[in-house]
Amino acid sequence: MTLQINAAFDGGNIHVVEQDGNRIYLEIIKDNQSDFFQWFYFKVTGAKDQALELVVTNASDSAYPAGWPDYQARVSEDRQDWQMTETDYRDGMLTIRYTPRSNIAYFAYFAPYSMERHHDLIARMAGKSGVGYEMLGKSLDGQSMDCLTMGEGRRSIWLIARQHPGETMAEWWMEGALERLTDENDSVARLLRQKARFHIMPNMNPDGSCRGHLRTNACGANLNREWAEPTAERSPEVLDVRNHMDKTGVDFVMDVHGDEAIPHVFLAGFEGIPDLDKAQDKLFRRYRNKLAKYTPDFQRHYGYENDEPGQANLALATNQLAYRYKAVSMTLEMPFKDHDDMPDLKKGWSPERSKQLGRDCLAILAEMIDQLPISGKDLA
């Protein structure tokens, strides 16, 4: 059987440059109409028991070259169990080594979350008691912008994920959060649904997800730089969601992401927005502190530098939503690399840990739910 490489499937991304026996030289393809690239996902067939060397030759030109040192690629032979494999970054090239036990092996930047799995998730959750579904609009490629709703309370809670499609851990987080929220035997879920109304977007960027992009939608727009002035022509995904937020109000919002370079889980807030409300900021810090005490997978030491007062970029979701609605707003970041605080030499940061973090984040939200504002009022 001849060794072949293919990425012509949902979320796939790779270009074969040259093959020299079991050493294959590859390039990651740029996002459409963009210079961003780092996400890869492809399959190798016909290489059973062969020691593969897969060399990504353009790694140094990727969006975040600091993401490659100490990184290990993910591999699976059944597309269910994803493990890390020997990977090194040297002279601007990323080399992945693996010996398949069967004739099919899949390699990815992180465990993929396919659009088929997304549709399965939406259908499974929409069929549960008390869960509603709304299509808030369509993407540039015509895909539905899927929103799940639940809860009877007055506080408006928004959870959004995967503005950057290559950050697949964000939708794994969503799967864990949704499974907990819809568990009728879970007291945390019951409390939250009693006290709040949830609006949940598991995938903000379906086009980029399907196309195998790292950070952009179909036309090359970075959705997390579109929240100040979204347009139907460039970023309908953001425009439709923000328009709906204008109708529902936003009291608490978490925007879920992955970070290429920082091997930790952390939160970023909105301290640089104009006219920062100290009580609003205090609630964010309280949430962050409680989460750090609750799970060893979260920490407060590593993360992004704070914006100077009044200097926040209001094109980012967290800043815009905190400013626009006086919401307790935050960005959650998870690593592509292994997790330095609690390393796992076999899987690294994984879908399973992402899902568990989704459950844990809800536990802290339940602790604080009575302290949150209602429609931007009553900050305490």
Swiss-Prot record:
SUPFAM superfamilies: Zn-dependent exopeptidases. InterPro entries: Cytosolic_carboxypeptidase, Pepdidase_M14_N, Peptidase_M14. Pfam families: Pepdidase_M14_N (PF18027), Peptidase_M14 (PF00246). GO terms for biological process: proteolysis. Its cofactor is Zn(2+). Residues 111-369 form the Peptidase M14 domain. Zn(2+) binds at H164, E167, H257. GO terms for molecular function: metallocarboxypeptidase activity; zinc ion binding. The active site is at E333 (proton donor/acceptor). PROSITE patterns: PEPTIDASE_M14. This is Uncharacterized protein ZMO1242. It comes from Zymomonas mobilis subsp. mobilis (strain ATCC 31821 / ZM4 / CP4).
